[in-house]
Amino acid sequence: MGTSEEELKHIVIDLGCGPFFLGINDKHFPGFLNKQSNACAIVNTASRETGGVHWIAMGWHPPSNFYLFDPFGFSDKKLLQIYQFEYNALLKRSAITSSPDRCVQLFQNNESVQSPHSAACGLYCCMFLHAFANWPAHPFDNPTMDQLVGVPNNMLEAPRAQSIFKQNQETLYSFLHYNSSFFRRYENKLRKQTDP
């Protein structure tokens, strides 16, 4: 089932991302259009009319750093193959409008932190946005994201990876319990919606 746009918005605000947060978007997200300030968003790989499929998070750190976080760590090619979603167009729009030399530097994770049987992708995106809001120059390498253990994509279904994913999800829930009053209030419901 996963998390709704409204649930994610409440959690992101609790995590202190409000000043940078552009909102929850579907696959038609226009990219980062303001070149002067940090910005971040959660984007679904499908259009809003479908009800959504998979959440990813993005961050912009001037003058030219574009961060993409996918809880599965998929490449653009894999996202296109599985979800019919491409982020190259977002990169191009952001480069043209936001970067002084019309170039952006893409940073993305390439390891999975989420089980393929989990629906917690939106919650993982919230955790990443907390990292971005606090460490915009290095949102993948900081005390927030260092709590999660990455697994190579080709091991996504491997039995030995499942215990790592289970621990990651418990770490995620603990992080959100500690940092989000909304999550604490609706924790049982959110766990039921996202547990594998």
UniProtKB/Swiss-Prot annotation:
Q: Which GO terms describe its cellular component?
A: host cell nucleus; virion component
Q: What is its EC number?
A: 3.4.22.39
Activity regulation description: Requires DNA and protease cofactor for maximal activation. Inside nascent virions, becomes partially activated by binding to the viral DNA, allowing it to cleave the cofactor that binds to the protease and fully activates it. Actin, like the viral protease cofactor, seems to act as a cofactor in the cleavage of cytokeratin 18 and of actin itself.
Where along the sequence does the record put site: Cleavage? 51-52
Q: Name where it's found.
A: Virion; Host nucleus
Which SUPFAM superfamilies does the entry mention?
Cysteine proteinases
Which GO BP annotation is one of this protein's? Answer: proteolysis
According to UniProt, the reaction catalysed is: Cleaves proteins of the adenovirus and its host cell at two consensus sites: -Yaa-Xaa-Gly-Gly-|-Xaa- and -Yaa-Xaa-Gly-Xaa-|-Gly- (in which Yaa is Met, Ile or Leu, and Xaa is any amino acid)
The UniProt keywords, alphabetically, are: Autocatalytic cleavage, Disulfide bond, DNA-binding, Host nucleus, Hydrolase, Late protein, Protease, Thiol protease, Virion
Would I find Nucleotidyltransferase among this entry's keywords?
no
Upregulation details from the record are: Expressed in the late phase of the viral replicative cycle.
Q: Which GO terms describe its molecular function?
A: cysteine-type endopeptidase activity; DNA binding
Among InterPro entries, the record links this protein to: Papain-like_cys_pep_sf, Peptidase_C5
Give the protein's function: Cleaves viral precursor proteins (pTP, pIIIa, pVI, pVII, pVIII, and pX) inside newly assembled particles giving rise to mature virions. Protease complexed to its cofactor slides along the viral DNA to specifically locate and cleave the viral precursors. Mature virions have a weakened organization compared to the unmature virions, thereby facilitating subsequent uncoating. Without maturation, the particle lacks infectivity and is unable to uncoat. Late in adenovirus infection, in the cytoplasm, may participate in the cytoskeleton destruction. Cleaves host cell cytoskeletal keratins K7 and K18.
Q: Which family does it belong to?
A: Belongs to the peptidase C5 family.
Q: How does it assemble?
A: Interacts with protease cofactor pVI-C; this interaction is necessary for protease activation.
User: What's in the misc comment field?
Assistant: All late proteins expressed from the major late promoter are produced by alternative splicing and alternative polyadenylation of the same gene giving rise to non-overlapping ORFs. A leader sequence is present in the N-terminus of all these mRNAs and is recognized by the viral shutoff protein to provide expression although conventional translation via ribosome scanning from the cap has been shut off in the host cell.
Protein name, entry field: Protease
Task: Identify the species of origin.
Answer: Bovine adenovirus C serotype 10 (BAdV-10)
- Identify the coding gene: L3
